[in-house]
């Protein structure tokens, strides 16, 4: 079982990655938007009674930081690819930009697709044109993600589940990797 997990969040600017992290780690919602260049934090979580140190790496969605973003990918155990349900470009960019960047840097790391700002479906100027869950699940299948989740950092809906799923996904991936090592035959001798 992993004692520490590195979780990296990627996606376009202003899709709610930082708000999601702040809500999860401090149970507050940031009132003002502040673009992220690069930030990381950590929390201790428990899974099946075992304490795990969860490292959370918030990346810049802005293309101006494309060259330094891969530094945060090193040794990641799970990636959360985030888009806003109220921003079609952020949704399209998961397939057209983010998945290729992740796969070129982390070819074997599990990815979860996370729809953020789901409160916008109920209130807000974009509610009629918001991306629905069916479209999100289809995208997750198209990019071969391990799962699809929805959340709203503003209303604190689904936030806990996102990180529970991230931890469980990383742990399961590590177990599969260890099982393969255990059962792989490197050398065969006949006596």
Curated annotation (Swiss-Prot):
Localisation per UniProt entry: Cytoplasm; Cell membrane
Propeptide: 189-191
Main location: cytoplasm
SUPFAM superfamilies: P-loop containing nucleoside triphosphate hydrolases
Region of interest (Interaction with ZAP70), ranges: 73-86
Superkingdom classification of source: Eukaryota
GO terms assigned for molecular function: GTP binding; GTPase activity; kinase inhibitor activity
Result of changing residue 83 to F: Abolishes interaction with ZAP70
Keywords for this protein: Cell membrane, Cytoplasm, GTP-binding, Lipoprotein, Membrane, Methylation, Nucleotide-binding, Phosphoprotein, Prenylation
Disulfide-bond pairs as recorded: none
Ranges annotated as spanning the membrane: none
UniProt cross-references to InterPro entries, sorted A to Z: P-loop_NTPase, Small_GTP-bd, Small_GTPase, Small_GTPase_Rho
GO aspect biological process, one term: mast cell activation
A GO CC term assigned to this protein in UniProt: cytoplasm
Membrane-topology descriptor: Lipid-anchor
Entry remark concerning the domains of this protein: The region involved in interaction with ZAP70 is a non-canonical immunoreceptor tyrosine-based activation motif (ITAM).
Function summary: Binds GTP but lacks intrinsic GTPase activity and is resistant to Rho-specific GTPase-activating proteins. Inhibits the activation of NF-kappa-B by TNF and IKKB and the activation of CRK/p38 by TNF. Inhibits activities of RAC1, RHOA and CDC42. Negatively regulates leukotriene production in neutrophils. Negative regulator of hematopoietic progenitor cell proliferation, survival and migration. Critical regulator of thymocyte development and T-cell antigen receptor (TCR) signaling by mediating recruitment and activation of ZAP70.
Name used for this protein in its record: Rho-related GTP-binding protein RhoH
Organism: Mus musculus
């Amino acid at each position: 079982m992993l004692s520490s997990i590195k979780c990296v969040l990627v996606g376009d600017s202003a899709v709610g990655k930082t708000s999601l992290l702040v809500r999860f780690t401090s149970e507050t919602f940031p009132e003002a938007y502040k673009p992220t260049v690069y930030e990381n934090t950590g929390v201790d979580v428990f899974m099946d009674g075992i304490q795990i140190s969860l490292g959370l790496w918030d990346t810049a969605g802005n293309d101006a930081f494309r060259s330094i973003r891969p530094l945060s990918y090193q040794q990641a155990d799970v990636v959360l690819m985030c888009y806003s349900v109220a921003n079609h470009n952020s949704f399209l960019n998961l397939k057209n930009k983010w998945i290729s960047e992740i796969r070129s840097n982390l070819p074997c790391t599990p990815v979860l697709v996370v729809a953020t700002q789901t409160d916008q479906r109920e209130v807000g100027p974009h509610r009629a044109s918001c991306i629905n869950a069916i479209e999100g699940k289809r995208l997750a299948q198209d990019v071969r993600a391990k799962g699809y989740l929805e959340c709203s950092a503003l209303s604190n809906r689904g936030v806990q589940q996102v990180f529970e799923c991230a931890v469980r996904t990383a742990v399961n991936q590590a177990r599969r990797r260890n099982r393969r090592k255990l059962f792989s035959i490197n050398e065969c001798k006949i006596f």
